[in-house]
Amino acid sequence: MIKLLFMGTPQFSATVLKGLLDNPAYEILGVVTQPDRAVGRKKDIKVTPVKQLALEHGISIYQPEKLSGSQELIEIMGLGADGIITAAFGQFLPTILLDSVSFAINVHASLLPKYRGGAPIHYAIMNGDKEAGVTIMEMIKEMDAGDMVAKASTPILETDNVGTLFEKLAIIGRDLLLDSLPAYLSGELKPIPQDHSQATFSPNISPEQEKLDWTMFNQEVFNHIRGMNPWPVAHTFLEGQRLKIYEAQLAEGEGLPGQVIVKTKKSLVIATGQGALSLIVVQPAGKPKMSIIDFLNGIGRKLEVGDIIGR
């Protein structure tokens, strides 16, 4: 039985971890995940999906704010793991830790060398890519630059957003890891170096990127909304208040960027740099997420054709 240390945080990671837990060839000695966070207006404490799964299986849990130089680092190095598996962990691994095990493998949600970094799925959708994928790669000190063990891809549909694509890629990543790991560990599967000259990067989404630019073409704004749903969520401004936009549809029409060009009891169409978008699901400041119909019956009832949002 191969003894593993698992490191990850979101549901993507938990899906991969569950695959390893269900496989009798592997024993998970411990998991390392991000610390619990206070979320929402009530500041409720939320544990990570990886921690929740580890609790259910009685696995030792380590949650350092920063792994390097921590007491937790000393403890996990003493577990005697054969190898490390990471998936969307969110921290760099110290070289001393990588050197302490026989192998260290990362499950990365992009077709490397494209989209190294923390937000590959967001950028794949925002950039209008036709496919996304997962790469199983060896871990080295440089971010997502290790040799590639295996790859798998899937189409990005017009109906996909970050949430749906995360779910698809988590399953693909789980299966790809379980399929390729035995051959990799036996030496039958030889890793392939990345072409570093082709590397692109997907840094974590900044607050500035969440704001919609209505001067962009409608397809670009549409992709941007999908690439922010369900987190961190794209927004615009209405009378100085933030209006989050979760869903929209491509529409026809002309007008100034951000201008209301159609308003009925059931629809609100906003002009972009070319074409337009029909808003479907929004969230006004201080309110719950709602359909555009509910919005137009409430806060949005004051909007008129010709008004401009986003200022």
Curated annotation (Swiss-Prot):
It catalyses: L-methionyl-tRNA(fMet) + (6R)-10-formyltetrahydrofolate = N-formyl-L-methionyl-tRNA(fMet) + (6S)-5,6,7,8-tetrahydrofolate + H(+). InterPro entries: Fmt (IPR005794), Formyl_trans_C (IPR005793), Formyl_trans_C_sf (IPR037022), Formyl_transf_N (IPR002376), Formyl_transf_N_sf (IPR036477), Formyl_transferase-like_C_sf (IPR011034), GART_AS (IPR001555), Met-tRNA-FMT_C (IPR044135). GO terms for cellular component: cytosol. (6S)-5,6,7,8-tetrahydrofolate binds at S110, L111, L112, P113. It holds the Pfam family Formyl_trans_C. It comes from the Bacteria. Its EC number is 2.1.2.9. Keywords: Protein biosynthesis, Transferase. The keyword GTP-binding does not apply. One of its GO terms (molecular function) is methionyl-tRNA formyltransferase activity. The keyword Hydrolase does not apply. NCBIfam families: fmt. PANTHER family: METHIONYL-TRNA FORMYLTRANSFERASE, METHIONYL-TRNA FORMYLTRANSFERASE, MITOCHONDRIAL. Belongs to the Fmt family. Attaches a formyl group to the free amino group of methionyl-tRNA(fMet). The formyl group appears to play a dual role in the initiator identity of N-formylmethionyl-tRNA by promoting its recognition by IF2 and preventing the misappropriation of this tRNA by the elongation apparatus. This is Methionyl-tRNA formyltransferase. The gene is fmt.
